[in-house]
Amino acid sequence: MGVKLEIFRMIIYLTFPVAMFWVSNQAEWFEDDVIQRKRELWPPEKLQEIEEFKERLRKRREEKLLRDAQQNS
């Protein structure tokens, strides 16, 4: 009885992670459940806001480079 129980436990220990990886790597499941849930919780930002943010970052970077160049010369 003890050996059979240990074999059963080992099969469960090995099968469960493999099954979880198999389920989570299904593209349809991932798209349907995970991506949709993410979009519900955090809707995508507006494209214009993202572009404005990138422009502000670019301007800051350029200003910093100009200041550094002026200090070094």
From Swiss-Prot:
Highest classification ranks of the organism: Eukaryota, Metazoa, Chordata, Craniata, Vertebrata
GO molecular function, one term: unfolded protein binding
Family label: Belongs to the PET100 family.
One of the GO BP terms on file: mitochondrial cytochrome c oxidase assembly
Name this protein carries in UniProt: Protein PET100 homolog, mitochondrial
Keyword Transit peptide (UniProt): yes
Cellular-component GO terms for this entry: mitochondrial inner membrane; mitochondrion
Function: Plays an essential role in mitochondrial complex IV maturation and assembly.
Compartments reported by the entry: Membrane; Mitochondrion; Mitochondrion inner membrane
Gene coding for it: PET100
Transmembrane regions listed in the UniProt entry: 7-24
Source species: Homo sapiens
Disease: Mitochondrial complex IV deficiency, nuclear type 12: An autosomal recessive mitochondrial disorder with onset in early infancy. MC4DN12 features include poor overall growth, metabolic acidosis, profoundly delayed psychomotor development, seizures, hypotonia, and brain abnormalities. Death may occur in the first years of life. Serum lactate and creatine kinase levels are increased. Patient tissues show decreased levels and activity of mitochondrial respiratory complex IV.
